[in-house]
Amino acid sequence: MIRKYQKSNVVIIGFGKTGLSCLNFFLIRGVIPKIIDTRQYPSEMKNLPSFVEYCFGRLNDFWILNANLIVVSPGVRLDHPIIIEAMKLGIEVVGDIELFVREISAPIIAITGSNGKSTVTQLVSKMAKQAGWSVGVAGNIGVPVLSLLKKQYELYVLEISSFQLDVTYSLRATAATILNISVDHMDRYPKGLEEYICSKKRIYHNSYFCVVNDSDPLTKPLLNDGIYHVSFSMNSKSADYRLEYYKGNNWIVANGEYVLSCAELKINNCMNYMNMLSALALSDIVKIPRIVSLQVLRFFSGLSHRFQLVYKNRNVCWINDSKATNVGATKEAINNTIITLRDGNLHLLLGGDGKLANFFELSCLIKHYAIHLYCFGKDGVCLTQSGFNDVFLSNNIIDAMYIISRRVQRKDIVLLSPACASLDQFSSFRARGNLFTYLAQRLG
């Protein structure tokens, strides 16, 4: 349903990439919103037209309470008292995904999860493009979803965060999946993990197919979510898409058929097996030719900043996993590293903004494998007090890397998998990963 907004009094809160895309969305429809950002100098202020009213450096309570539509960017907290008051008054509060899904009718594949979202989004979109389809890819991967409205596509593949799902109500995905759930964003969900899970499960509402991780009970949809359920798993023999050992190799099995030997893959680790199983399930649902999908899996070499080998010298491997911004992602990275580690030691860089996460699980794993730990950033001190052994504390990643360079020996692995957000010291996880890569090549 295409909504008419001409008589709406619209306020946009947050003026980064998403906020700018929302502004352009309304200007094209003849509506001039008001712009609010608590930052004094929002990142997109240079692109603000002179005729648009704005309030920077604080929230404007009067504007908010007199709006009839409030559009919030993902970084805006919904538990702010003035936002809560607006919702109590019946003022509509939505995000960019909600605006988008009201405008389009083509099939949507919707992907969320604590880890692996970007990888699965890229896999499915590559499968569709290789099949000759026109595909719109956007969401939490850095491309504002509203930018896709400039042209029509046959299929939309959306990576959606929990923050975006909190203010999305009209999503009706052809296929929706929660890849996995681990503790994350506890600074935004004060009621704890259950509140975070409820946010994630909003992706299933009104979907046609729910693609479910059989290995993670936290991802299971409610009985009334979705018309059909399709499952994937590495260890469940009842899953529709699974991994099985067959003729001397692990194989990807789809609905009982052995479709691809893992020996043919460029990347062989547990993280990518799960991503590939879910991507194949999603692509099969929208009827992308399987022969095309399997070819994409064969040649997929991974994403930048996601468990990426960026340098190897003197038999020392330097792995950039800067995209690991929560405990679950770092646990996966450690487990995958330990499998390949022979006689050397693992040096782990951990730190940034921990988002009030509990690092106890991580400390047990690190102590079990006698990992050398280097903490840095906003929560570096907190991390050193989380029960870890053999810990070095640095102000920043540069100092930590210099310490590592003096300690590292042949056959060692250096892993940046911070379990924390990057915004305390970097503009993004990409900037953090790029600095690690530069330092590895210089110091290694």
From Swiss-Prot:
The keyword Amino-acid biosynthesis belongs to this UniProt entry's keyword annotation: no
Source species, domain of life: Bacteria
Listed EC numbers: 6.3.2.9
GO terms of biological process kind: cell division; cell wall organization; peptidoglycan biosynthetic process; regulation of cell shape
Residues engaged in binding ATP: 113-119
Class in the EC hierarchy, top level: ligase
Protein name as catalogued: UDP-N-acetylmuramoylalanine--D-glutamate ligase
Organism: Blochmanniella floridana
